């Protein structure tokens, strides 16, 4: 059956595989690339070790949030592909994303469907009374 001893030994523990900073932080966005871009962008003389991790996490969160809402908009329109119109609908219908991206123009996004209250037909009680009093 199985032996009770250690399966590796000294050789298995010394051959440790390296993990990227994205994998250590459990992120999909590349922490190393964000760090490089922060250094090359001359935003500051020095960049802390935690700054690119935090920035990559924030960017990943925003991307996931927008894509999730856009996917819901695409599914509501019975489409399987997200197009700029779905991005526009997702961003403009979400209060916080609309505030964050308020001055952003999305190409081919269109406008939100909106009809002013004064332009809608009035619901009057005359129609109901007139129909009930007819003989």
Curated annotation (Swiss-Prot):
The modification Phosphoserine is found at residue 132. It comes from the Eukaryota. Keywords: Acetylation, Chromosome, DNA damage, DNA repair, DNA-binding, Methylation, Nucleosome core, Nucleus, Phosphoprotein. The modification N6-acetyllysine is found at residues 6, 10. GO terms for molecular function: DNA binding; protein heterodimerization activity; structural constituent of chromatin. GO terms for cellular component: nucleosome; nucleus. CDD domains: HFD_H2A. GO terms for biological process: DNA repair; heterochromatin formation. The keyword Acetylation applies. The modification N5-methylglutamine is found at residue 108. Residues 1-24 are annotated as: Disordered. It is found in: Nucleus; Chromosome. A motif ([ST]-Q motif) lies at residues 132-133. SUPFAM superfamilies: Histone-fold. Phosphorylated to form H2AS128ph (gamma-H2A) in response to DNA double-strand breaks (DSBs) generated by exogenous genotoxic agents and by stalled replication forks. Phosphorylation is dependent on the DNA damage checkpoint kinases MEC1/ATR and TEL1/ATM, spreads on either side of a detected DSB site and may mark the surrounding chromatin for recruitment of proteins required for DNA damage signaling and repair. Gamma-H2A is removed from the DNA prior to the strand invasion-primer extension step of the repair process and subsequently dephosphorylated. Acetylated by ESA1 to form H2AK4ac and H2AK7ac. Coiled coil: none annotated. InterPro entries: Histone-fold, Histone_H2A, Histone_H2A/H2B/H3, Histone_H2A_C. PANTHER family: HISTONE H2A. In contrast to vertebrates and insects, its C-terminus is not monoubiquitinated. The [ST]-Q motif constitutes a recognition sequence for kinases from the PI3/PI4-kinase family. Core component of nucleosome which plays a central role in DNA double strand break (DSB) repair. Nucleosomes wrap and compact DNA into chromatin, limiting DNA accessibility to the cellular machineries which require DNA as a template. Histones thereby play a central role in transcription regulation, DNA repair, DNA replication and chromosomal stability. DNA accessibility is regulated via a complex set of post-translational modifications of histones, also called histone code, and nucleosome remodeling. The nucleosome is a histone octamer containing two molecules each of H2A, H2B, H3 and H4 assembled in one H3-H4 heterotetramer and two H2A-H2B heterodimers. The octamer wraps approximately 147 bp of DNA. This is Histone H2A.
